[in-house]
Amino acid sequence: MLKWKWVALALVTSALSANAEESSKEKFLNNYGRMLAVEARCPSWKINQQKVVEILNSFKIANADIEPGGHDWPAIERSIHSNQRAFAGIGPKMMCVKANAMYGPKGAVSPGLMEPK
């Protein structure tokens, strides 16, 4: 009986770990879409591609998956559109301030994912 409890515990732990990883992946995809929306409106900041590649590798996401038509593109596209609406009234100068605050070297959301051009 004890053996089955350990098997059940292992299955639950494995499922929770997979859910946490998927949750982190979804957060990254959402942030990536937001960064694309920010980058389109801010002329002085760009996405730090080196950091993005590191994250893609950690989640085992292929570059093609985050391009239009790719496996993960729908989640990114939803984030882009949502953030474009949210940022509609924000000018380029303020958008660059937000880029730094969210994704710059000391960013509150994900530090280092954007850098000055």
Segments the model singles out, each with a brief description of its role:
Residues 20-47:
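Immediate post-signal-peptide N-terminus of mature secreted/exported proteins
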Residues 15-17:
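N-terminal signal peptide c-region/cleavage motif recognized by signal peptidases
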Residues 45, 50-117:
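Compact alpha-helical subdomains of small soluble proteins
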Residues 9, 24, 85:
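Generic anion/oxyanion-binding catalytic loop in active/binding sites
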Residues 2-9:
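Sec-dependent signal peptide recognition
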Residues 1-2, 41, 69:
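Acidic, low-complexity intrinsically disordered regions
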